């Protein structure tokens, strides 16, 4: 039985920075995907300017608060399954789910931590 698990993803996230600096835009791709249980899934987040490793990934399920998965681009938050991993620095980052599980149905967000409004 082919069990399809859709995962809606945030397409564009704009974060405003203080002072004279330009806004940093984060663009996630793909904007939507459909995958099977057991698949390897990769989500990309691109920043409009370098943010070193100051990036976090969140998972949000309907009716629930966002859950921190990864911070500092690649550090797994305590309690998060090891099938989740993050990589990248500068302007390009990836979130990988090595073997998709039914409970991974969610919306996934990247957030830059380089500066705050």
Curated annotation (Swiss-Prot):
Major site of localization recorded for this protein: secreted
Location of region: Complementarity-determining-3: 111-117
Region spans: Framework-2: 57-71
Signal peptide (residue range): 1-22
Subcellular location: Secreted; Cell membrane
One Pfam family named in its UniProt record: V-set
Ranges for region Framework-1: 23-45
Region: Complementarity-determining-2, residue numbers: 72-78
Gene3D superfamilies membership: Immunoglobulins
Chain residue ranges for the region called Framework-3: 79-110
Keywords: Adaptive immunity, Cell membrane, Disulfide bond, Immunity, Immunoglobulin, Immunoglobulin domain, Membrane, Secreted, Signal
InterPro entries: Ig-like_dom, Ig-like_dom_sf, Ig-like_fold, Ig_sub, Ig_V-set, IgV_Light_Chain
Single biological process term from Gene Ontology: immune response
Cystine pairs: 45-110
Residue ranges of domain Ig-like in the record: 24-117
CC annotations in GO: extracellular region; immunoglobulin complex; plasma membrane
SUPFAM superfamilies in alphabetical order: Immunoglobulin (SSF48726)
Domain of life assignment: Eukaryota
Subunit description: Immunoglobulins are composed of two identical heavy chains and two identical light chains; disulfide-linked.
Task of the protein: V region of the variable domain of immunoglobulin light chains that participates in the antigen recognition. Immunoglobulins, also known as antibodies, are membrane-bound or secreted glycoproteins produced by B lymphocytes. In the recognition phase of humoral immunity, the membrane-bound immunoglobulins serve as receptors which, upon binding of a specific antigen, trigger the clonal expansion and differentiation of B lymphocytes into immunoglobulins-secreting plasma cells.
The protein, known as: Immunoglobulin kappa variable 1-9
């Amino acid at each position: 039985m082919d069990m399809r698990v859709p995962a809606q993803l945030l397409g564009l996230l704009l974060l405003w920075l203080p002072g004279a600096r330009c806004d940093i835009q984060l663009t996630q791709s793909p904007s939507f995907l459909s995958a099977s249980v057991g698949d390897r899934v990769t989500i990309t987040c691109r920043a409009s300017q370098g943010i070193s490793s100051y990036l976090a990934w969140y998972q949000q399920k309907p009716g629930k608060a966002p859950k921190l998965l990864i911070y500092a681009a690649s550090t797994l938050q305590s309690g998060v399954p090891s099938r989740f991993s993050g990589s990248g620095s500068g302007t390009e980052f990836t979130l990988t789910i090595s073997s998709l599980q039914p409970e991974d149905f969610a919306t996934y967000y990247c957030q830059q931590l380089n500066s705050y409004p």
